[in-house]
Each structure stands twice: as C-alpha cells, then as structure tokens.
Amino acid sequence: MTKNMTKKKMGLMSPNIAAFVLPMLLVLFTISSQVEVVESTGRKLSWAFNGAPIVFTPPSSSCGGSPAAVMASEWMPRRPCRRTRPPGTNIPVSQSP
C-alpha cells in the first residue's frame, strides 16, 4: 500500500464516524428533551426507558409544588393558582345585621 492509499482510507473513515455519531447525538438530545414530569391530584412518575415500576406519590400541598413546576415557570408566564374546592366546602359568607 502506498501513502496515498492509506490517506484515502483514513479520509473515508472520519466522515463515516461523523455520519454515525451526529445523528445519534441528535436522537439522544431529542429524547432527553421530551422527558417531562406531569403533576396532578395523585402524581405518577415513571421512567419510560429503564423498566422501573411506576412510583405513586401523594398530591402536593401547594399549587405547582414540584421543582419541575418551578423551573417551568421561568420560561412560561405565571398564572394565579386556581384550585377547585370539593363539593360542600364553601366558605360561609358572614352577613351583617
């Protein structure tokens, strides 16, 4: 083999590696940006990829109580907390005579 043939082989190797690594990095970044924590009355958190069982956590005591909600509020506009009350828990209005 001559030096010229060796350079051609090495030159072909680098673009092949780049053509494989760059799409893999793009896929990894896309998947990692899609992971979300959804908060509801009874939160269920699970990781889709490791096969761990779903972990049930009790509802938070405050509106937007998880750190994920705090971080999301940095780039989303803030809204007032609107929690609905269960039926029969209306606050009595004091009436003056």
From Swiss-Prot:
The keyword Secreted applies. Residues 1-33 form the signal peptide. Induction: Induced by drought, salt stress, jasmonate (MeJA), ethylene (ET) and salicylic acid (SA), mainly in shoots. A motif (SxS motif essential for MIK2 binding) lies at residues 60-62. A motif (SCOOP motif) lies at residues 54-67. Mostly expressed in leaves and stems, and, to a lower extent, in roots, siliques, seeds and flowers. Interacts with MIK2 (via extracellular leucine-rich repeat domain); this interaction triggers the formation of complex between MIK2 and the BAK1/SERK3 and SERK4 coreceptors, and subsequent BAK1 activation by phosphorylation. This is Secreted transmembrane peptide 4. It comes from Arabidopsis thaliana (Mouse-ear cress).
